[in-house]
Swiss-Prot record:
Monomer. GO terms for biological process: arginyl-tRNA aminoacylation. This is Arginine--tRNA ligase. Gene3D superfamilies: Arginyl tRNA synthetase N-terminal domain, HUPs, Isoleucyl-tRNA Synthetase, Domain 1. SMART domains: Arg_tRNA_synt_N, DALR_1. Its EC number is 6.1.1.19.
Length: 562
């Protein structure tokens, strides 16, 4: 619909150039066509006249009047009016929305998909949890947001690669290995001799027992077997990392999250990528030595202070491999790189970007892009749930899925802006009522399936072509409200992709479900008159399709029965 209105406005501007109202060399402005905040102001509004007023040497409202008069007639536009300082508001005819139903039916699964990305490459990194324990609910939020964002970008025509970065090097892995070794040697977290910074969850005992039993872990086709030797710390390290990576993969699969690339931090050292990044920075002239350490002049690139890259003992600070890792993304040809992180990583953003800018390789400012999420509080029975017996100190993603469902967890972890703190109410997520938004939306889809089954049971033969031809009979308030919501879907998908905000899909689906449920309660679908019945079934099927399309972008199922 936006495309139709933009075309009409463009023709009107050409007419004003032709009659001299606008200078002949006036370029069409980058005007906006958007939905007003309230329906009273029409279905769409444009600021075109306000942008052209200066060129026309006219006040915006007068030019808006001239542009309105120059607009070509269209059966899809019922009324056009001027508002405020020069906005032009369009009220669409019912035929415009009825035609959109036909577009939904024709395009099916492709309805709402766009070409904004034009096949360009984007790498989306998310979760990237240390392989030191079970995934917690914060990782779950990262997984839900990141996976849905990747789906939304794919729907906008981007060539998306999903990436998981494993921090499998450093002190945390050392602490993991020492913790498993202590368990393998018969110690418990309460014993004298337990590692000072060791991990204390019950899962450590699971890893130790599997190692001592000589179990084999199949990690993405790579077999790692426990050697049963509690003194072999290196074997324990390899086995523990493989075991816990495999556990994380199990949880992510249950959560309908997968990846194209698993990138290991250890490979950056093995393949010389860390040293390559350091040498590029030294060659750029943006480093200096002081106190036996190597420093990056990151203040030259917006950081609040210069950063140590290599300490006096020769080891690298943690942001250096981060810079090296993102350098590989650039070298792999990602036009865009998007990293989803917890808000507690905010401090690393500027220094990573500074490191990339300092290399002077033509990497754009603001590359990579970041999506930051806030923490999650889990509630049950009005009280906060803080611990998991298995993890020892936090609520795991597996716990949450087992208590509710993957659908509910994904929905609730996506459905708010990432930068807002989120409360996950287990009781609400389990409720089969309209108060539960995921139930409410899924029930709308299942309700359409139920109506189609009822039609078949009653012996009604649904003729979709007939229904499309008879949509004009659906001109009541509630039918048009559903059609209006259906027409919004492509815009919502596009905006969610531009803003990197998949939560907008969830908000939209709730509004569509509300419009559908309201229509259903106020309109008998299976009437005797075939024309009206087929038209209503066609509207229901179009709603079913858009609900399914949107739920797929969230990674939430569209059930046929509930």
């Amino acid at each position: 619909m936006k495309a139709l209105l933009r075309a009409l406005i463009g023709q009107g501007i050409e007419a004003l150039r032709a009659n001299g109202t606008l200078p002949a060399d006036t370029l069409p402005p980058d005007f906006v066509v958007e939905r007003p905040k309230t329906r009273e102001h029409g279905d769409f509004a444009t600021n075109a006249a306000m942008l052209l007023a200066k060129a026309a040497r006219s006040n915006p409202r007068a030019l808006a009047q001239a542009l309105l008069a120059a607009l070509p007639a269209s059966d899809d536009v019922a009324k056009v009016e001027i508002a405020g300082p020069g906005f032009i508001n369009f009220h669409l005819a019912p035929t415009a929305y009825q035609r959109e139903v036909a577009h939904v039916i024709k395009q099916g699964h492709d309805y709402g998909r766009g070409l904004a990305g034009n096949g360009r490459s984007v790498g989306v990194e998310y979760v990237s949890a240390n392989p030191t324990g079970p995934l917690h609910v914060g990782h779950g939020r990262a997984a839900a947001i990141g996976d849905s964002l990747a789906r939304v970008l794919d729907a906008n025509g981007w060539n998306v690669k999903r990436e998981f970065y494993y921090n499998d090097a450093g002190v945390q892995i050392e602490n993991l290995a020492l913790s498993v070794q202590a368990r393998a040697q018969g110690l418990t977290p309460d014993s004298d001799g337990w590692p000072e910074n060791g991990y204390r969850g019950d899962y450590i005992a699971d890893v130790a027992n599997a190692y001592l039993a000589g179990d084999t872990v199949d990690l993405e086709g790579h077999l790692v077997t426990g050697t049963k030797d509690p003194a072999d710390l290196e074997s324990i390290r390899r086995f523990a990392v493989a075991y816990l990576r495999n556990e994380q993969n199990h949880d992510l699969a249950a959560f309908r999250v997968d990846f194209d690339i698993y990138f290991l931090e250890s490979s950056l050292y093995k393949d010389g990528k860390v040293e390559e990044a350091v040498q590029k920075l030294i060659a750029s002239g943006h480093t200096y030595e002081e106190g036996g350490a190597l420093w990056l002049k990151s203040t030259d690139f917006g950081d609040d202070k210069d950063r140590v890259m290599r300490k006096s003992d020769g080891t690298y600070t943690y942001f250096v491999p981060d810079v090296a890792y993102h350098l590989t993304k650039w070298q792999r040809g990602y036009e865009r790189a998007i990293t989803e992180l917890g808000a507690d990583h905010h401090g690393s953003l500027t220094r990573v970007r500074a490191g990339l800018q300092a290399m002077e390789l033509g990497i754009p400012q603001g590359w990579p892009e970041y999506v930051l999420h806030q923490m999650v509080t889990v509630m049950r029975g009005g009280e906060e749930v803080k611990l998991s017996k298995r993890a020892g100190s936090y609520v795991t993603l597996r716990d949450l899925i087992e208590e509710t469902s993957a659908d509910a967890v994904r929905w609730f972890l996506i459905a708010r802006k990432p930068d807002s703190q989120l409360t996950f109410d287990i009781d609400l997520a389990r409720a089969q009522s309209n108060d539960n938004p995921v139930f409410y939306v899924q029930y709308a889809h299942a309700r359409v399936c139920s109506v189609l089954r009822q039609a078949q049971e009653k012996g009604y033969k649904y003729d979709q072509a007939h229904g499309l031809a008879e949509l004009a009979c659906l001109d009541d308030e509630h039918s048009l409200a559903v059609m209006l919501e259906l027409s919004r879907y492509p815009e919502v998908v596009e905006i969610a992709g531009q803003a990197l905000e998949p939560y907008q899909i969830a908000q939209y689906l709730r509004e569509l479900a509300h419009a559908f449920h309201t229509w259903y309660h106020n309109s008998k679908v299976l009437v005797d008159a075939a024309a009206e019945r087929d038209a209503k079934l066609t509207l229901a099927v179009a709603t079913q399709q858009v609900l399914a399309n949107g739920l797929e972008l969230l990674g939430v199922s569209a059930p046929e029965k509930m």
